[in-house]
């Protein structure tokens, strides 16, 4: 399973990167608080970026708007397009996934339209963390969680 992490707290980012490195996950992208890790046993691209922004996706997905259904560059261009954008991409992206997209220093994160892919988050005075592993939210937020 790939991992997606966003946090605006550098200490939390360091803690979570330490956990990920112990699990021998390979980082595909890391900048501006967003980090994307590749699937461990499947060789697949889950991140595309250029000077204007980035798109990172985790889960199992296919894009129904291209001859190559796994072309992140096409997804990225469609997200940037004034004619298409997020709603268009969500309608043409199938599967169980979470997608993070940065353009113009704005972060957008969404999951598949059926909400089958779980993302967890914490927003507090110390910062924000979004990840696809609940354990990691608890690890950095120091909150008491019911069992």
Residues covered by each model-derived region:
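Cysteine-centered catalytic environments shared across enzyme families
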Residues: 1-147
């Amino acid at each position: 399973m790939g991992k997606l992490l966003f946090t605006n707290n550098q200490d939390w980012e360091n803690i979570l990167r330490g956990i990920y490195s112990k699990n021998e996950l390979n980082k595909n992208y890391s900048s501006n608080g967003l980090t994307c890790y590749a699937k461990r046993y499947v060789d697949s691209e889950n991140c595309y970026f250029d000077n204007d922004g980035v798109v990172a996706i985790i889960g199992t997905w296919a894009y129904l708007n291209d001859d190559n259904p796994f072309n992140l560059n096409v997804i990225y261009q469609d997200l940037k397009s004034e004619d298409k954008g997020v709603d268009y991409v969500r309608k043409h992206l199938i599967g169980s996934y979470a997608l993070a997209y940065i353009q113009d220093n704005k972060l957008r994160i969404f999951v598949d339209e059926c909400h089958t892919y779980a993302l967890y988050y914490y927003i507090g005075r110390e910062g924000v963390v979004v990840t696809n592993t609940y354990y990691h939210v608890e690890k950095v937020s120091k909150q008491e969680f019911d069992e």
